[in-house]
Amino acid sequence: MVLTTRHHLDGFRSIQVMLGALEHPLDVMKASKGRSCSENDHRMYRFSKNLPRGVCSPLTTGPHPTTHLEPTMHQPHRSLLRKAFQMIPPLDGSLHKGQAGRIGIVGGSKDYTGAPFYSGYASLRLGSDLSHVICEPSASTVIKTYSPDLMVHSYLSSPKEPEAYASHQNLFEQLLDRLHVLVVGPGLGRDTEMQDWAEWTLKTAIKKKLHLVLDADALWLLVKKPDLLRGYPNAILTPNHVEFQRLLKACSIEPRENDDDGLLAMELSKALGGCSILQKGSIDLVAREGSEVAKVSCEGSPKRCGGQGDILSGLVGTWCAWTKLYFERQSQDEKPKSHELPISSEEAWIIAAVLGSEITRTCSRLAYHKLGRSMQSSDMLGYIGEAFELVMHGHTKD
């Protein structure tokens, strides 16, 4: 089987079939034992030849010690992530525009226009079909100039203009009916009017049972009003260290000096009623009430630059959309496909958070190996496709 980069999602679907046809996923690797490296390459994948200098394809022998990708999960989570192939929309001609994910990014204000671009564009680079940015009018023209691939809506207007405000609320609510997931927070800011819009957005989205990703200043809103999300499980929060500490305090959870086991994140998930927590740090921790804590420790970049968290929110958002689409497909199928293993709702949310984190870290690493100290978040966007291939292939191995 020869698969070009253009057909890599078809390849993942094919490998998923192969995995189901064998007694155990590891038999895929055993079945290839005895063939040459080149034969195995052609049988499994043909990866892009444009990897940065010094970065080896995972199918070549003698990988570079700092770029070799290995799954970082404990065995239960590694087995779980193999199920993720089932969630990826197939590229087999059966879908029409929008059926691989319609993403909404709520953010973008007078002072912050880059963040919603990073989030929305990252979602497209991972494989969603349509990405909408809902922003403040003063930010819309600027964001439109960044990319023609984004659809930008200047709905977050001031209530000081009541007629326009009411009209924009109506248009925004109509747009929500077409989306699979809403990422709230990138470039939102803490201005009272923008925070009020975020509150209205969360309340409306929850009524419509939309999948949610909350980042940046949407978490600031949640610190002030934690009851907004309490009891709603269809959400992932992506706090950094400072944001996480604020959320703990808002939920009356006593912080601990050392928390590398994810127990505080689990407590936060329980306090908020079951949403998922992706706690960002040197090791990313993923916690959800009723599930084991997952740790993501694959190599990222030592360079910290603004926008990486926004890229993460867009990637996680795409996986959340694929989660919703997966369960919609399952409900429409009369009987499950014989090669597929069932995925529970709790498992799907863990998969979305973990793989969003792994792909972010991997594209950051690839960009850093190419550009070093000069790397910026904009450089990461071009590596999302390669990072996706590397991460997903890593989860076919023992």
Swiss-Prot record:
Positions binding ATP in this chain are 280-284, 300-309
What is the uppermost EC class here? lyase
Show which residues constitute the signal peptide: none
> What's any one GO cellular component for it?
cytoplasm
Q: Which GO terms describe its molecular function?
A: ATP binding; ATP-dependent NAD(P)H-hydrate dehydratase activity
Q: What does this protein do?
A: Catalyzes the dehydration of the S-form of NAD(P)HX at the expense of ATP, which is converted to ADP. Together with NAD(P)HX epimerase, which catalyzes the epimerization of the S- and R-forms, the enzyme allows the repair of both epimers of NAD(P)HX, a damaged form of NAD(P)H that is a result of enzymatic or heat-dependent hydration.
Of which family is this protein a member? Belongs to the NnrD/CARKD family.
Indicate what this protein is called per its UniProt record.
Answer: ATP-dependent (S)-NAD(P)H-hydrate dehydratase 1
What organism does this protein naturally occur in? Answer: Puccinia graminis f. sp. tritici (strain CRL 75-36-700-3 / race SCCL)
